[in-house]
A protein has these predicted regions:
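Intrinsically disordered, low-complexity Pro/Gly/Ser/Thr-rich segments with frequent PxxP/GP/PP motifs
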Residues: 1-31
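Beta-sandwich strand segments
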Residues: 34-43, 329-330
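Beta-strand/loop-rich accessory regions of lumenal/periplasmic or secreted enzymes
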Residues: 14-19, 48-355
Length: 355
């Protein structure tokens, strides 16, 4: 097809019935070698979403009983021969035992609002010449990296088919409330944990880097499968080359080894994630995630990638929302307004289940 030309291609009849995801992928490739471009070299691509699969989850059809045990420190829910153990001092899921009694978590499921700083977050700051406008300096100045968790309320409801645990938490930064959340855990008879999160931020503070969750899984699998944007890392303002798809990748492909360790490897618009026995599903809007042998804490502290040390299990970060990375000019806090988390209220939902 010549430059500026047009072509019509009629597609065969497609099953538009809601039972499958349908995408139309178009690639523009060179027919033959042209200057520096080899033949069959992709010069452009575009993806069109024709249909998204409609998913329903049957949580009631289970013969398993669901029981509740409570003492002064812990709340234990037994469902589908598994145990979900909550820490009553902070409302976090602190332990998850499978049907054989194997521990699935090495670090509790907690909320997370910061990221290991990117070069762009640091900007032109130096030890002796701090740039107060840099995102990292703004987050540090208000205390986002030293948040104090204040449990306000924890309410438990039990029915025949589920246990609902509602946790209200304030996150204090240098004596002021920066964030408030209500986490609603729904544990069903089939062993599924649905987590609904309502988030509110103090708009006097800078916008956070992310609004999400963090947990350290005991499992260390070789591969990960997910349905979302890929195959490479992508962020709100760095996703133009990514495509929706069912991606099956090695866990080593999920990190990007930047010379200076930082937040990396995010995959956005994820509907479903499968890693080892764990299945994570988006309920409503999609989520973003990254999987790594390195915690955000270690990434933030080490100065070079080769200094990183693999940790036990696998760190999983799940974000309902994540700000852009900026870097339009490579040295200033240039994240566009549309990619900042400026709203006062956010909501997201994800479900966790062992397969």
């Amino acid at each position: 097809m010549p430059a500026g030309g047009a072509m019509r291609i009629d597609l065969s009849e497609l099953p538009i019935d809601g039972t499958d995801n349908l995408f139309l992928d178009i690639q523009v490739k060179t027919i033959e070698k042209y200057n520096l471009l080899e033949s069959d070299f992709e010069v452009a691509h575009q993806q069109f979403v024709l249909q998204e699969k409609i998913n329903f989850t049957d949580r009631i059809d289970s013969s398993e009983e669901i029981t509740l045990l409570e003492d002064e420190e812990l709340l234990t829910v037994r469902s589908a021969k598994q145990k979900f153990i909550f820490n009553k001092s902070n409302g976090n899921l602190s332990r998850w035992l499978d049907e054989k009694g194997n521990e699935k978590l090495l670090h509790e499921l907690s909320e997370q609002f910061t990221r290991a700083p990117l070069d762009n977050d640091i900007g032109v700051s130096e030890v002796e010449h701090i740039d107060s406008n840099a995102w990292l300096e703004r987050w540090k100045a208000v205390g986002f990296y030293e948040l104090k968790t204040l449990l306000k309320n924890m309410i438990i409801q039990a029915t025949e088919n589920e246990v609902i645990i509602s946790v209200q938490t304030d996150y204090e930064a240098k004596g002021k409330i920066a964030f408030s959340t209500i986490r609603e855990y729904h544990i069903f008879r089939n062993g599924e944990l649905l987590l609904k999160v309502d988030f509110k931020r103090n708009i006097e503070f800078p916008e956070p880097a992310r609004i999400g969750l963090c947990l350290q899984l005991a499992e260390k699998a070789e591969n990960v499968t997910y349905f979302g944007l890929g195959p490479d890392e992508n962020y709100p303002d760095r996703r133009g080359a990514s495509l929706f798809g069912q991606w099956n990748l090695r866990i080593t492909d999920m990190t990007t080894p930047y010379i200076f360790p930082s937040e990396n490897g995010l995959r956005m618009e994820t509907r479903e994630l499968n890693y080892g026995r764990l299945k994570v599903r988006a309920m409503g809007q999609s989520f973003a995630f990254n999987l790594s042998p390195y915690s955000q804490n270690q990434l933030a502290k080490k100065g070079h990638w080769h200094l990183l040390e693999e940790e036990a299990g696998t760190w999983l970060n799940i974000d309902g929302f994540h700000m852009g990375v900026g870097g339009d000019d490579s040295w200033s806090p240039s994240v566009a307004q549309e990619y900042l988390l400026t709203k006062g209220n956010y909501h997201y939902e994800v479900s966790f289940k062992l397969t």
